[in-house]
Swiss-Prot record:
It catalyses: N(6)-dimethylallyladenosine(37) in tRNA + (sulfur carrier)-SH + AH2 + 2 S-adenosyl-L-methionine = 2-methylsulfanyl-N(6)-dimethylallyladenosine(37) in tRNA + (sulfur carrier)-H + 5'-deoxyadenosine + L-methionine + A + S-adenosyl-L-homocysteine + 2 H(+). Residues 1-21, 481-504 are annotated as: Disordered. The gene is miaB1. Residues 25-141 form the MTTase N-terminal domain. Belongs to the methylthiotransferase family. MiaB subfamily. [4Fe-4S] cluster 2 binds at C178, C182, C185. Catalyzes the methylthiolation of N6-(dimethylallyl)adenosine (i(6)A), leading to the formation of 2-methylthio-N6-(dimethylallyl)adenosine (ms(2)i(6)A) at position 37 in tRNAs that read codons beginning with uridine. GO terms for cellular component: cytosol. This is tRNA-2-methylthio-N(6)-dimethylallyladenosine synthase 1. It comes from Mycobacterium marinum (strain ATCC BAA-535 / M). Its cofactor is [4Fe-4S] cluster. [4Fe-4S] cluster 1 binds at C34, C70, C104. Monomer.
Length: 529
């Protein structure tokens, strides 16, 4: 195999039905973990559909089940192996059924997955998503499990076709990998060092999505505001020059996305406080399409714990960023991530976290109980906190944040909010007939359409007046103030989602039949937040 190409074939994704007729094989992708994983799952689905598979109907048994896994939290491990155990007898009763395990846990536990679940057919990692169809066919042909884990990225996942889940909102990856070394996190060792997509390629993908009706994009990266430190090399066929390091690249990217006609909402996740710069705040404030929402992980409010976590910022730095954001964008919603019970966390350390939460007045927070992950420095630290202490602190933190969230949401009662109508995110019952939408600042709003005739569709935009509030959502039970039907709503009504082909990304493309594929065995290279 040459170094310039990763090779794919178009394997025959068919099976025989009960009458002996060849029919397309069905697939299901189950995602565990973060937004990066969810976006990778869209790429896996796109690859499979490109190879001839069709998506299984909800609740119907699939001929292929793919797990895209997470290695950050223990419950993701438990969920994976519990699901695999549940599938074992189903697979035994369905000749030809296949199971594949990919993602961060597969990258980390490459030698363990088959020991614990020998009925798995394919194990692949974070760096070779594009190999999935070939590995499935090789396993089927050889009647043997295939394990292929690469140690470095050859192709950006965004170079692969995608089967998007939504007609109106899309994720767009701007980088992969991470250059930080947080002691609780295993992602850098699984996804590698940061590599940034070239801005022209990102903008081309966003433009293609908008042309298909998408109204909102979320720019994804492990650390979006370090974008520009390591641009990928250009595709040699383009004749483009390599791009120099550019610390202002993320702010420039936000402004450039904001100039794309038809793109109404821009979000991004997640920035790192240590590298958050004033030019990004200015770009957020001056670009109308950028939503007034900042999700910025805190992790702890104690300088001592932040140092132990290797977070490379301190509480005053964090609070200073929030002050600047609120000065420039007074109505911004600010959300965060917090870990409780990190090794060595004292009661004073925890009270420091509560103090930052009080001062920051987060709109909402994702709160987690620390769990040691093998392979991370924190797992071997002394002074691991007893479970009962962690639970008690967790409950105190949640109670405080719930109170702050409710106060924040109540402050919006009586205000007018523009909502992007969403599918599957809220309450809808026979009594209220409510459906749901997301405000520009990201808050979930349950509202009552003027009629139940389906004229308000996912992807449409509506204006409502907020009538009530709860910690995790808002209510708008009055009449609609405005309803704008959109091309995204038209597509949603038709059940149509955008399709994106590979865009030139400055790393080797997947190409068809440019070198010989080994017919069996393990690839020689075998071995996140």
């Amino acid at each position: 195999m040459t170094q310039d190409h990763i090779v794919t074939e178009r394997p025959p994704a068919t099976r025989n039905d009960t009458a002996g007729n060849a029919t397309a094989r069905t697939y299901e992708v189950r995602t565990l973990g973060c937004l990066m994983n969810a976006h990778d799952s869209e790429r896996m689905a796109g690859l499979l559909e490109d190879a001839g598979y069709i998506k299984a109907d909800p609740g119907a048994p699939a001929d292929l089940v793919v797990f895209n896994t997470c290695a950050v939290r223990e419950n993701a491990d438990n969920k994976l192996y519990g699901s695999l155990a549940h599938l074992a007898p189903i697979k035994a009763s369905r000749p030809g059924m296949q199971i594949a395990v990919g993602g961060c846990l597969a990258q980390k536990d490459r030698h363990i997955v088959l020991d614990r679940a020998p009925w798995v057919d394919v194990v692949f990692g974070t760096h070779n998503i594009g190999s999935l169809p070939v590995l499935l066919e090789r396993s089927r042909h050889n009647q043997d499990a295939q394990v292929e884990i690469l140690e470095s990225l050859r192709t950006f996942p965004s170079a692969l076709p995608a089967a998007r889940d939504s007609a109106y909102a899309a994720w767009v990856s701007i980088s992969v990998g991470c250059n930080n070394s947080c002691t609780f996190c295993i992602v850098p060792s699984l996804r590698g060092k940061e590599a940034d997509r070239r801005p022209g390629d990102i903008l081309a993908e966003v433009q293609a999505l908008v042309e298909q009706g998408v109204l909102e994009v979320t720019l994804l990266g492990q650390n979006v505001n370090s974008y520009g430190v390591n641009f990928a090399d250009p595709d040699p066929s383009t004749g483009e020059e390599p791009l120099p390091r550019d610390r202002g690249a993320f702010a420039q990217l936000l402004r450039a996305c904001g100039r794309i006609e038809g793109l109404e909402r821009i979000r991004f996740t997640s920035p790192h406080p240590a590298e958050f710069t004033d030019d990004v705040i200015l770009a957020m404030a001056e670009t109308p399409a950028v939503c007034p929402h900042l999700h910025m992980p805190l992790q702890s409010g104690s300088d001592q714990i932040l140092k132990a976590m290797r977070r490379s910022y301190r509480r005053d730095r964090y609070l200073g960023i929030i002050d600047k954001v609120r000065a420039a964008i007074p109505h911004a919603a600010i959300t965060t991530d917090i870990i409780v019970g990190f090794p060595g966390e004292t009661e004073h350390d925890f009270e420091q976290t509560l103090d930052v939460v009080q001062k920051a007045r987060f709109t909402s927070a994702f709160t987690f109980q620390y769990s040691p992950r093998p392979g991370t420095p924190a797992a071997d630290m002394p002074d691991q906190i007893p479970k009962n202490v962690v639970q008690q602190r967790f409950e105190r933190l949640v109670a405080l944040q719930e109170r702050i969230s409710l106060e924040s949401n109540r402050s919006l009662v009586g205000t007018r909010q523009e909502l992007l109508v969403v599918a599957g995110e809220g309450r809808k019952n026979a009594t209220t007939a409510r459906i749901s939408g997301r405000a520009r600042d990201g808050r979930l709003v349950h509202f009552r359409p003027d009629s139940a005739d389906g004229s308000v569709r996912p992807g449409d935009l509506v204006d409502v007046e907020i009538t009530d509030a709860a910690p995790h959502h808002l209510i708008a039970d009055g009449p609609l103030l405005q309803h704008r039907r959109t091309p995204a709503g038209d597509a949603s009504e038709r059940g149509q989602t955008p399709t994106t082909r590979g865009v030139g990304l400055g790393v080797p493309r997947i190409t068809v039949a440019q070198a010989q594929i080994p017919s069996s065995g393990t690839h020689p290279d075998t071995a996140c937040r």
